Every structure is written in structure tokens, then in C-alpha cells.
Amino acid sequence: MESVRTLWLSVALALAVGSRVVRGHPQPCRVPTRAGASVRLAALLPRAPAARARVLAALATPAPRLPHNLSLELVAVASPTRDPASLARGLCQVLAPPGVVASIAFPEARPELRLLQFLAAATETPVVSVLRREVRTALGAPTPFHLQLDWASPLETILDVLVSLVRAHAWEDIALVLCRVRDPGSLVTLWTNHASQAPKFVLDLSRLDSRNDSLRAGLALLGALEGGGTPVPAAVLLGCSTARAHEVLEAAPPGPQWLLGTPLPAEALPTTGLPPGVLALGETEQHSLEAVVHDMVELVAQALSSMALVHPERALLPAVVNCDDLKTGGSEATGRTLARFLGNTSFQGRTGAVWVTGSSQVHVSRHFKVWSLRRDPLGAPAWATVGSWQDGQLDFQPGAAALRVPSPSGTQARPKLRVVTLVEHPFVFTRESDEDGQCPAGQLCLDPGTNDSARLDALFAALVNGSVPRTLRRCCYGYCIDLLERLAEDLAFDFELYIVGDGKYGALRDGRWTGLVGDLLAGRAHMAVTSFSINSARSQVVDFTSPFFSTSLGIMVRTRDTASPIGAFMWPLHWSMWVGVFAALHLTALFLTLYEWRSPYGLTPRGRNRGTVFSYSSALNLCYAILFGRTVSSKTPKCPTGRFLMNLWAIFCLLVLSSYTANLAAVMVGDKTFEELSGIHDPKLHHPSQGFRFGTVWESSAEAYIKASFPEMHAHMRRHSAPTTPHGVAMLTSDPPKLNAFIMDKSLLDYEVSIDADCKLLTVGKPFAIEGYGIGLPQNSPLTSNLSEFISRYKSSGFIDLLHDKWYKMVPCGKRVFAVTETLQMGVYHFSGLFVLLCLGLGSALLTSLGEHVFYRLVLPRIRRGNKLQYWLHTSQKIHRALNTGPPEGQQERAEQERSGPKDELPATDGAGRWRRVRRAVERERRVRFLLEPGEAGGDRPWLCSNGPGLQAELRELELRIEAARERLRSALLRRGELRALLGDGTRLRPLRLLHAAPAES
């Protein structure tokens, strides 16, 4: 048999090595690859139908995968009877199929537990038993093949909690008071082992009856002595039901401090008839059977995974267990190896941390609360949470009556509180943590996104070893975080911070409180620090400190920019100013023309006598160019008076244009309007019109106030409310806006207004519903008075004012200094009037063009035919040239024909004896009538149009005079060129056509 097995293993190893070489399989070379290979975990189901159904449901979940392509198969077996023989046969049937490596059992009696331990040791197959507390019994020496897990809190864990309380109070001598314990001697021994000290008294009350004086007489040993002292400082009550514990505490004499050793739920703890200061403990949440079964399957899977990595051949080749032949080497090797790995396995499961001690005792995470019977503010007895115990660590709340556990150095350990908060600017901000998951500034806080207590406990436990994902780590800072840090420093406590899972302040929904209030009531947090409004509904279920911030409710609206009208671009100046500007422009142009034509140095024929003249149209062009700041080719006046007037007009235009542009931006944006609301009693809120929407934050103090005071208003606004304040502000500022008004705490609204970059938000109306922000704590918390006292000190010392200045000292929106790069953005609708004006200008240009053609084709020929209005040089040089030079364009063709025909002859006289006009002889000569000098114009010789003889002589005389004028002009032009060359003038000389044409004509 052994040789066959060895040969088979050799073949398998060879195949594995070949597979690794050929395919690069990542498995070790000695591990055979068998597709679909599986190992089996058997489950011996409980007899109760309800428990059996729950176990089957837990086993139906997919089993975890194992290394080396292994799978874990779950096999469930139910035994019809629970006698020892049937149970033994059932377990042997469970272990008979091949591949079964371990089993899970649910013993319901002590004989079953003993039988399971015997069979596990005999078959060397690990068995994990899930026990109830009453099934526990002494089984002799523990065996590594039988692991036990207590579903409920085991007695050892309860004793650990009690011993931690005794040591925290520094009680050296205590008394054990037992109500109904099966083996008092074993219990006392167990206490002595845990406390390292035997109790001073042990009172067994199982035979004493409360209906007579026997119970009171038995407890008299614990009463105060004659000297005023007590025999023991504390007494621990164990094994008592709620009713029996009430009877014992009512009959107990005054003196010792009582501890209820049996965990009880909070609602089962009595409050009347008990001595003050009684300490009780209770498990916060008992683990479900499904979670326990899941973790036990995970325990076996974790051990199998570890074994498969170290000894893959034992995990892959488990042998069949035969109860008739228990000497099988393969089974012995696999079972012992798996038992050794089970004893060293620990992981984080659904029940929390899971670990094994002593190779046979399985532990899961336990969490207990410690309560103390106190007096509430009205004097009534009430239970208050004073501490908590988890996985061997006892933590007291600050201000609790219990003493702290002394540290080795003699200093007192700082307790740790769990604080819940809610992000609300500026009281609490959040940002991402750094690459290492730490916060250089602010406090590290978790954002779990859930309100599950087990999940929170697991996350904070993982935070200690740094295994929390970075996505859940946040850095919290703000007004309330600074206040919390100061309180922690003055009250000497540490804290761990997390953000509320549902993001709500808290309201009563379907009989349960949500948000911050729900976390305080469920014991998930010791205090709530944020902008937590104090109101009557919340004060009935949780406690608040004195307010550290006073505020009220307010209404925030958004300003709207009205559209600018078409003529908005003219609004910077009054209509009278526009009329005055254009009237001054035309009047200035007129005076410029008059000064230029009356000056001996003006650009006119009488003045400088050049080819161009300064007319009224030139003056208008110049004045418009100066007014609108455009650079065009325009004629400028040459006389000093005209230039002075031109500069004066430029100064006038500069001042007017500067004033216009300074007011243009504000006018073009348009007016800012907003919803005018006088307050919460405004008719717009109580009788909203169609389309008017307003809301608040869900489950906030503002919603609670409106719901209680104005139910109809709340019915209208609840469908428009937002989950948080930033969401509500975003709905108000969206485009188009989803809200017309937003109601919330005025302190939060004022901050949103101060940081609004667009200056679109403002608060309106009178404040209402004066309230304050306080720190929330569970009812009857001993921290309330201490925190309130320190908050009052902070107000008196000015620390609260410093916090307000730090987080609220913002630049008001109306006085904000804009950056240089920040510009006013205006759309097309702002300049709609200018576009309309441009379109009108295009239409007017068409009319002007039509008028130009009418003047050129109809008016101009009529003026040419007449003798009046021939001199237009002072008004328009173009019109003057058109009247006194060549023919109109319509006569161009006829002029060309006449130029190609016979030479022009002198006109003859008509029959009336008068000379006809000789315009035809010079109609192609483009000339300008310059004013001649008086001496030259004073001759008495007749002109062309004159009557009389001597025409040939006069013509020759004129030609001589023209030649002389040309010579003088040539000399002048040459001299001007020389002067310009000397002065550095780069202007090129005009072509001297007259100078070049003279020799040709001669």
C-alpha cells in the first residue's frame, strides 16, 4: 500500500514539474494540478428545526476558495436521535466519505460534548463545537482535535470583564455572591486564576429565600462594621436572573459597591429599589448563529489554506477515515497537521476578531458596556454608561466615578471616546488624507458610510494597525474640531472621530431615531460634535451641553440679473447729454471751418492755396474721429485758432468718453432683483404661487420647527428639501434655479453668502426660531456637566470669540476686491441695442447711397446748367470739382468721341449778336479756379468770354505768361526738394508733370 502511494506521488510530482516547465504554472513543483479537486467539511446539524434551518442557511453561502485549485465542499448530516450510539454512528458516517478533513458540530448536552471530544481524539480529525453556555463542562485535559466556541459570552470572558472593573477601582478584597451555580468550587477557582487573588468572602444564596429573613441575614455579613468600615469594598453577584438580582439588591445592607456579574440587556435592568452606584454590564450585541457558523467555516478554510501552502501533499491527498480501523497513517498525518494549523489561526470575521487559545478554545470579539445607576437632573434613578470593555481593554468615559487603571509609570491613562460628527461648513470641513493616510493638519476621521456598530468597531480596530483603506480616511477640521481638541486637552481624554453614516442630524422615523441622535442612542458614539441644534424633541432622548454657538433660522434667496433693454448702451448718459454732445460736435465743426477759411494760414485757396482744402465735411470727419477715438485719414486745420479749438474738443471728448465707459459695465449688466421675503410669516411662503419652490434640509432642526409650527407649509416644501446644506445652496444657484428660497440655520447661510464668488446669494427677512448649538451626549452621561462647565469658561475667556473670528471672518461679497484677471462677462443680449443700431445704420447707409445717386444724376446737372451755386469749395471739395471740372459720367462717351474728332473751334456768335459760352473748349481740362493776386487780376484785357478783336495777340500773351509761371514753379519745386533733403524729410517728390510737359509743348 505504501509503495503504491509512493509511486503515485512520484508520478504526480513529475507531472507537476513538467506542467511548470511547459506552461509556467505558479504552483510549487511538488503540487499536482487536479482540476476540480476538493476537500470536504462535514457539519453535524442541531436537532431543533429552527436552529437547523439557520445553520443550513449559513452553510448555503459559497465556501471560500483554497490555494492550488482546491475547493472546500460543505456536507451537512442530521442525526435523527441524540443518544451516544446514534451520535457516534452519525459522526463516523460523516467522516466516511473521501476527502473529509474536519467537521462542525452543535452539541446540545454535556454527554454529547464528551462523546465528540472522544471521537475527535480517536479519529484524529478536528471537530469544532459551537456551544451554549450551559453545555460547558470540565472535560479533563484539552485535546487539539476538539475546538470549542461559546455562542454566548463564555464565563471566562465575563470574569475578565469583572476582574478589569475590580482592578480599575483598585479593590483588593471582594466578595463573591452566588445565586445558582452548579459547581461553586470550580467557579471560585476560575475567579482566583483570573484575578490572581482569592475572594475574601463567598456567599451561596441558592438555599436562602427572600420571603423570610434568611436572605437578609445571609447578606448581613457584608454590612458596615461598627467602626464605619466595611468587610469588603465590593461584592460581585453571579448566576442570578433579573428578578433574583433585584431581590438580593433590595435586601443588601448599605456598605459595599455591588457589581452585577450576569450580563443583562439595558431594558431589563431595574431602576427602583437598588442602592445607588450599582455597576452592571451587558453585551452590546450578541453574535448571530449565522455569523458564528460562517466564521467557523472560515476558520477551517484559513487553516487549510495555510496547510496547503506549507504541506500541499497532505491537503491534496486526505485519506478516508474508517472508524473500524483507526490506524491509518494518511489520516493521522492530515488530521494532526490541520489541528496544529487550527490552533495558530486568527483572522477578522463577521463576528469581529477570531483567534484560538490553548489549541482548543476559539474566541470571537466581545464588546460589553458598563452601566452605573445614577440620578438624572430631575433626581430620578437612571442607568448611565460609564465605560466599555472590548477584547481585554476597559475604557472609562471622562468624568465617570470609576478610577482609571494606573499605568506602570504611575500616571493615569487617558480614556478614549468615540465622537460622531457631520460635515457642515464652517463647523466641520473634510479633505483627503496624504499618501500615508495621515493628516498633517486637522484630525483623522473615518467616513464609513454606514451606521452598523460591528462595522464601526471593526474599522476602528483596523485603524490601529493601519489596514483601513485610504478611501475611508478623511481629515476633519473646522470650528467644532478646534473646540473638540481644546476640550480633549482640558479634560484629558483621547478621541476617535467618524462621520455619521446617513449624513443626517437626526429625526424620529418609523419609531427609530436616525442620524446623530440614532448613533448616540445606539451607543455607537459617546458624543456628537457639529452644528447640532438643541430642540425639545432631541432633548427628550439625548443630553446636550450648554450652547457654544447661538443662532436662528434664516431665509436665503438668489439675486437675478434682469435682461438689458435695447437702448441700454445709451443709459450711461442722459438723453440731454447725448443731444448736447452731438450739437456741440456740429457746432465745433462749423467754427473750425469758419476759423480756417478766415485765417490767412488756413488750408484754403485764399490761405495756403494747395490742392486740398479744409471744408465743413472735413471738420465733421475730424470731430467724429476725435469723439469716438478712431484713427482715420482726415484733414486737420492749419491755423492756430483751429488747432486750439480742435485740442479743446479732444479734451471734451476724453472726459465724456471716460465717464461713459466707467458707467457702461454696470448699466449693461442690468438690475439685480431678488425674492423679497419679510420672514417666516410672509404670504409667499404660506400661500405659494405656482412655480414658487422653497425647502430646507431633511431631518434638520429647521424642518422640525416648520413641521411643528406650520404643517401646511411643511407639506408644500418637503418635496423640495435637500439632504445637506451644500445641496440646498446648489439647488438655489443652479441655472435654471430649482429653488426660489432656502430655509436653514442663519449661521450656515451667512457663511455660504460670505464665500459666494458670484455674489448671487443673500439672506432676507427677519430671523426667527432662536436656537443654539450644543454637544450631544447619551442621557445621564457624566460628561454633560463637565463639558458645559468648560464651555462656559471658554465663553468667559474669549476662546469662543476667537473661534468665531477664525472661521467667520470673511470678506463680505459686496466689498470683495476683484483680481486683475477677473472681468465682467457680458453676453449678446447686453449689446442687443448696439446690434439694432448697426442694422439701422446699414439701412440708413442704403438711403444715403440712394440720395447720393439722386444728387449726382438730378441735382448736380441742374446746378451745372445754372449760373448760381457754382462755388462749393468751403463745403465740399468733391462737389466743387464735380461742378467745375470734367463732365458727368453720362457724358464721358460723348467727350471721348469729340476728342477723337476735329479740333475744337472757337464758338461763333448767335443770331442775337451775343457770344456763346466757351466751356466746350476747356471741358477736358481738369483745373481749379485759384484766387489770383490783385495785381494779376486787375488787368483790363478781355477773357475768353469777352467780346472784341485781338484774340490771337491775347492768346500769345497768355502763353508767354503761362511759360513764365512754369519756370517759376519749376524753380520753387526744385528748391523745396533741396530743403526737404537737408531737413531729412523722406517724402518723395511728386512727379513734375508740368515741368516735363513744357518742352514738349514748346
UniProtKB/Swiss-Prot annotation:
Chain intervals with Basic and acidic residues compositional bias: 891-906
GO cellular component: endoplasmic reticulum membrane; hippocampal mossy fiber to CA3 synapse; neuronal cell body; neurotransmitter receptor complex; NMDA selective glutamate receptor complex; plasma membrane; postsynaptic density membrane; postsynaptic membrane
GO molecular function annotations of the record: glutamate receptor activity; glycine binding; ligand-gated monoatomic ion channel activity involved in regulation of presynaptic membrane potential; monoatomic cation channel activity; neurotransmitter receptor activity; transmitter-gated monoatomic ion channel activity; transmitter-gated monoatomic ion channel activity involved in regulation of postsynaptic membrane potential
Superkingdom, taxonomy of origin: Eukaryota
Extracellular membrane side: 25-574, 662-832
Catalytic activity: Ca(2+)(in) = Ca(2+)(out); Na(+)(in) = Na(+)(out)
Biological process (GO), any one: regulation of synaptic plasticity
Protein name: Glutamate receptor ionotropic, NMDA 3B
